[in-house]
Amino acid sequence: MNIDVVQLLDQNPILLIFVVLAIGLAIGKIRFGNLQLGNSIGVLITSLIMGHLGFSFNAEALTIGFMLFIYCVGIEAGPNFFGIFFRDGKHYFILSMTVLVAAVSLTYGLSHYFGLDFGLSAGMMAGALTATPVLVGAQDALNSGLATIPRNMDFSLVLENLSVGYAMAYLIGLISMIMFAKLLPKLQKQNLSDSAQQIAQERGLGNSSQRKVYLPIIRAYRVGPELIDWTDGKNLRELGIYRQTGCYIERIRRNGILAHPDGDAILQEGDEIALVGFPDSHARLDPSFRNGKEVFDRNLLDLRIVEEEIVVKSDAIAGKRLSDLNLSEFGCFLNRVVRAQIEMPMDLDIVLAKGDVLQVSGEKSRVHGLAEKIGFISIHSQMADLLAFCSFFILGIMFGLVTMTFGQVSFSLGNAVGLLLSGITLGFLRANHPTFGYVPQGALNMVKDLGLMFFMVGIGLSAGGKMFEHLTQVGPQVIGLAFIVSVVPVVIAYLVGAYILKMNRALLFGAIIGARTCAPAMDVVNEYAKSTIPALGYAGTYAIANILMTLAGTILIILS
């Protein structure tokens, strides 16, 4: 049986798409030392080569890809978007705007000075900033008519310029950002480890950010004379058992009767108490608790320890510090804090925002009591609320179609902005109403990534025909300009953050990387800081940066 692969791919466009995806994703896993190409650039390079070899596909059919991608970006940003001005939020907003304004200004000025073709500058900026939303915003402005294509060009040629510019600049942007993360602290003689420790000391973090996470365990002890002497007649509230031992007294058996103690309870000789705490806390208990006094009573030990993810929802909690929760009052143990899918240091001074996820363990009723106070327990269902997902998608498209008129000028926001706004709204509502609009994070990631990959395949196959012509004509020039656009805004943002905003350097480097939406560079900064504290800064800028980058692509292509 003979199979003509070329003919097979020509006649089966769906097969072509997934062949390009499979090859591109495999290429994206290639590493050069610590540098990985990544899925986006792998798929784009593959689709450009396939397009150059003569394979084609109707790019219009793949616009659903960028629509899904930008919609999911909005959903992820929604819970934290409106909390951007909490505590350091203004600093993060200023840094994101600094990178954006500097990049757009530089790209606009350099592209006009060197006479870059229409569309090439937007693609170059998207690659130099490793920010795919720039590319999405630019193409949507073309599709919606916000940007006017020059008379001597057509849509397909502009699309070629966008994709080739992105492909040529992306690696420059990625490498330069990683080098920035490695070299600038040394050039400035900054010790990121010291900066991280400084924040830890100022905010009461200590070493908790690096501790391993365990489930608490239950052990029971009989109260003897030594323990009575230790309590000195004080009640449980006065004793502060948790402060001294790291364990909570969950139950007391007295005269055969089981009870849940309150703060006024006073221990008596012969009581049997059930303590809940981490294994190391039990090991550190005073000998008056442990020596020969452990008991094994099934009824006393019959407690259900659970670990739940609690989503912050309460207006009374959002904007307050983690320490204000007083977890010791609830008998709960905090294991992790996650914001925008980024694990945060266990900083007692971190300001909580709606949508933050606290991984908490403890006795079931206590954990549920805490959840009622601060928000809700995250749904562990594998079912998505597709009705809400689709409805808000429709609203986003409809909003993007609305035409506004100012005098003689009429314009619409376009699909990208409309879907961003509807996605942010859905994400925000999801953070406040646990049963509404739920989409499992894994499903959301898959839709977002697959949408982005479809988008890359579409523009790559459409643009690949003249790829090598572009490389020979403007390749060196675009690469040089991409380096400038990648590095200069970052340096400006560093100067603003360090000398005007006077930010801690560990937070500043994390924030700049978030403003550049360059996740690979975060590993470098965390390694240099010997801490996850820079993630505080990264999470602060990442959500707003994704939104601003989309708008930047729209603005730049209109100005061009």
UniProtKB/Swiss-Prot annotation:
Q: Where is this protein found?
A: Cell membrane
Coiled coil spans: none
**What InterPro entries is this protein classified in?**
AAE_transporter (IPR050144), RCK_C (IPR006037), RCK_C_sf (IPR036721), Transp_YbjL_put (IPR023017), YidE_YbjL (IPR006512)
Q: Name one Pfam family in it.
A: TrkA_C
- Its main subcellular localisation, reduced to a broad class, is membrane
What the record says about family reads: Belongs to the AAE transporter (TC 2.A.81) family. YbjL subfamily.
Name the chain's protein: Putative transport protein VP1232
**Ranges that cross the membrane:** 8-28, 37-57, 66-86, 91-111, 164-184, 386-406, 409-429, 443-463, 478-498, 506-526, 539-559
Residue ranges of the RCK C-terminal domain? 205-292, 293-376
Top-level lineage group: Bacteria
The UniProt keyword set, sorted, is: Cell membrane, Membrane, Repeat, Transmembrane, Transmembrane helix, Transport
Bilayer topology annotation:
Multi-pass membrane protein
* Any single Gene Ontology cellular-component annotation: plasma membrane
Q: Which SUPFAM superfamilies does the record cross-reference, listed alphabetically?
A: TrkA C-terminal domain-like
**What biological processes does GO assign it?**
potassium ion transport
Which Gene Ontology terms cover its molecular function?
Answer: monoatomic cation transmembrane transporter activity
